[in-house]
Amino acid sequence: RQDDGHIYWVNAFQNSYGENRSTTHNDEAFWIQVKVLEWGGYPKIETLDQYYDLLERYADANPTTEDGAKVIPYTMLCEDWRYFCIENAPQFLDGYPNDGSVIVDTDTMKIVDYNTTPTAKMYFNKLNEEYNKGYIDPEFATQTYDEYIAKLSTGAVLGMCDQWWDFAYTVNDVFKQTGLDLKGCNYVPLGLTAKEGMDNMWHTYADTLNNSSGLAITKSCEDVDAAFQFVNDILEQDIHDLRFWGVEGEDYLVDDDGLYYR
């Protein structure tokens, strides 16, 4: 604990150098199946209303899957700490990145609880509307995480809001094993906003500050400076390359544009 009464910790999740070239959105988004986009002619979807309109129209035209299972236009997960699948959406709809529990307005340097905004009211009203029309999974409030993953894995769920890492490792593997990936069941992320034409920061190339956890140095640490230096060093590019790529010239090559390849 410092003299000001606070305990500080280090956000050591990642450090980006240069241009991020990742192609996977390993974060939160509204997701939709490829086959739904294809059916709709790959429309431009900017808003929540446009998103649900496409889900509704597809479900009305295709009420069952190829094997006869009932299509679930939209489901939500709210078991335990995973309630973020429902609760986080207003900050994205207002055009902000995932800054944790609040919206940070960098112009006014004010923070706002995104559950108290007009956009949040619009969002939850929309969920109620879709639920009452029968387009939201009636089991969403009671289903467990395992039940949620099982539903997604059948290919019957057209859309949801979730973190990629929360479902993709399991669901994508099942799709590959069952051939559902070839039938357009894979999920595509969408950066929705409350209104058309708004700027959005839903995809931040994994550079979103995570202020909910981190590394702290205990008071029994004999060399605090060395401990922090170690944390700093393991985030260096050389360590990243060695861990994920290997030895340059032996395990991978780098082209003239700085792109790594094997």
Question: Where are these predicted regions, by residue range?
Answer:
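Extracytoplasmic/secretory soluble proteins
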Residues: 1-262
